Swiss-Prot record:
The gene is MLO14. Residues 441-462 are annotated as: Calmodulin-binding. It comes from the Eukaryota. Residues 1-13, 85-158, 303, 388-406 are extracellular. GO terms for molecular function: calmodulin binding. This is MLO-like protein 14. Residues 35-63, 180-281, 325-366, 428-554 are cytoplasmic. Coiled coil: none annotated. It comes from Arabidopsis thaliana.
Length: 554
């Protein structure tokens, strides 16, 4: 009887001011801590000149702002939407994940459990009574029902909150695990720079490309079809152990340096980290297609479909496919080099886009982005169902499938973060083009300024033959591909005038082992006349500037 005579909920007009002030203080305090933490992190990234990570953080802030805006809209319009009435014929049992009888049964079972355990009895009973009363509540005229109830709007609001927290957390953990894994390869890079007698280069040339002894030997004795099948099987299982070994790293490092005409002392490891940091901003945030995926999932998650279980298989399957493909790229390069007779001098590894699906290495990054989002969505859905509907609800009734979903989700996320993403950062350097991270920031800013100036001239009809931009420190030739973050260095194009190379500025003695900054040599896309003028202008620029590196005298 006491439960039936309990007063209804108090409004703010009937609530003591001290309780309102206490709750408001707590929310403001927590929000300020989060805001200042993000602000300090942004300042630290800017101070350490980690612009790619700063851009990724800005993208996360945009995602939180978008989700916060959605949350505000839901809060502001919940009463209005709940008062929109539609015919009851639209609310049939075909497009519902649970039936009213199941909801009633589950809530009554939960009430009896709470009564037996006496744990937070009043809170649970009050919430459950609201839900039970909401099931049969009719705020519309006879034959009509709310388009979406007020309780449903609140539950959707909580899902947005859980989704934001889960996705941001997964994004940070993904980057953290990937960086930890890549930093373990630093010792191999240091070994190369410590090898002053170049002995490691000789060993790498003669032995490093035969690291996969099993299928290299099989390659010379078995039919081609079996060969390919065996290679794929080995590549599939290699991603579960040491996905990258020392010989893998040194093989791909040497191929990258030879293909792009860099010196053997180039710091490939630092370049790879810079490249991964720039690509990390592409796998954070929620794009339009991913939001479409969420909407489609909400639409087709009907009773008996077990859609959550089948969707949990997608990310782990994609992780295994992407990992096997990346391992297959390494295996292909190793087999190509193993087929060369006794490693003839002058033969070099041929990194190229043809090694990847559809000749697009960046496609793998899009798949990794989807994998990360799907895993975050899977975990957020589980927490949401548990919080809003209970552990024994119709969403989580089959506990075996729930456990399988969680195991697959966590396993796929760990494998993607600690194995697949670092492997992607290494293997995608084997494409035809090198990435913009190879260029120093000063050169990239100059090229970007040239592109903006050229586009401005074209808009005003002032574009002429003189397509160079002069600064106080350098003269840079045309590079239109900068906007795509890739500079083309394909070997198939004929080099008739001058070849675009990246050389390291070394001391005149030639015995320096320090890693220097690459600079641009003359570009192959300009004519001989323009090149002569460019040389003259560069000489004048060198005489005017004192900020360019100078040769050291022995």
């Amino acid at each position: 009887m006491r439960e039936e005579t309990e007063p209804s909920e108090r409004t703010l007009g009937l609530t003591p001011t001290w309780s309102v002030a206490t709750v408001l203080t707590i929310f403001v305090f927590v929000s300020l801590i989060v805001e200042r933490s993000i602000h300090r992190l942004s300042n630290w990234l800017q101070k350490t000149k980690r612009k790619p990570l700063f851009a990724a953080l800005e993208k996360m802030k945009e995602e939180l702002m978008l989700l916060g805006f959605i949350s505000l809209l839901l809060t502001a319009t919940s009463s209005t939407i709940a008062n929109i009435c539609v015919s009851s014929s639209f609310h049939n049992d075909r497009f519902v994940p649970c039936t009213p009888s199941e909801i009633n049964e589950e809530l009554e079972s939960t009430i009896s459990t709470v009564k037996r355990t006496q744990l937070t009895r009043s809170l649970f009973l009050h919430t459950l009574r609201r839900r039970l009363s909401g099931i049969g509540e009719d705020t519309c005229s006879e034959g009509h029902e709310p388009f979406l109830s007020y309780e449903g709007m609140e539950q959707l609001h909580r899902f947005i909150f859980i989704m934001a927290v889960t996705h941001v957390t997964y994004s940070c953990l993904t980057m953290l695990l990937a960086i930890v894994k890549i930093h373990r390869w630093r010792i191999w890079e240091d070994e190369v720079h410590m090898d002053r007698n170049d002995c490691l280069t000789v060993v790498a040339r003669e032995k490093i490309f035969r690291r996969q002894t099993t299928f290299v030997q099989y390659h010379t004795s078995a039919p081609l079809v079996k060969n390919r099948l065996l290679i794929w099987v080995i590549c599939f299982f290699r991603q579960f152990g040491h996905s990258v070994v020392r010989s893998d790293y040194l093989t791909l490092r040497k191929g990258f340096i030879m293909n792009h005409h860099l010196t053997l002392t180039y710091d490939f490891h630092s370049y790879m980290i810079r490249s991964m940091e720039e690509e990390f901003q592409k796998i954070v945030g929620v794009s339009g297609p991913l939001w479409g995926f969420v909407v489609g999932f909400m639409l087709f998650n009907i009773k008996g479909s077990n859609l959550y279980f089948w969707l949990a298989i997608i990310p782990i399957t994609l992780v295994l496919l992407v990992g096997a493909k990346l391992q297959h790229v390494i295996a292909t390069l190793a087999l190509e080099n193993a087929s060369i007779t006794e490693y003839a001098s002058g033969i070099k590894l041929r990194p190229r886009d043809e090694l990847f699906w559809f000749k697009k290495p960046e496609l793998l990054l899009s798949l990794i982005h989807f994998i990360q989002f799907q895993n975050a969505f899977e975990l957020a859905s589980f927490f949401w169902f548990w919080w809003q509907f209970g552990y024994n609800s119709c969403f989580l009734r089959n506990h075996l499938l729930v456990y399988l979903r969680l195991i697959l989700g966590f396993s796929g996320q760990f494998l993607c973060s600690y194995s697949t993403l670092p492997l992607y950062a290494l293997v995608t350097q084997m494409g035809t083009n090198y990435k913009a991270a190879l260029l120093p920031q000063r050169v990239r800013e100059t090229i970007n300024g040239w592109g903006k100036a050229t586009r401005r001239k074209r808009r005003h009809g002032l574009y002429g033959d003189d397509s160079t931009i002069r600064t106080e420190t350098s003269t840079i030739a045309s590079v239109d591909e900068y906007n795509d973050q890739v500079l083309d260095v394909s070997e198939t194009s004929p080099v008739q005038d001058n070849e675009l190379e990246l050389q390291l500025i070394r001391g005149a003695c030639g015995n320096s082992s320090s890693v220097e900054t690459p600079i641009l040599r003359p570009c192959a896309s300009i004519s001989s006349t323009t090149f002569s003028r460019l040389q003259t202008e560069t000489t004048d620029s060198l005489s005017r500037s004192s900020s360019l590196p100078m040769r050291r005298e022995c």
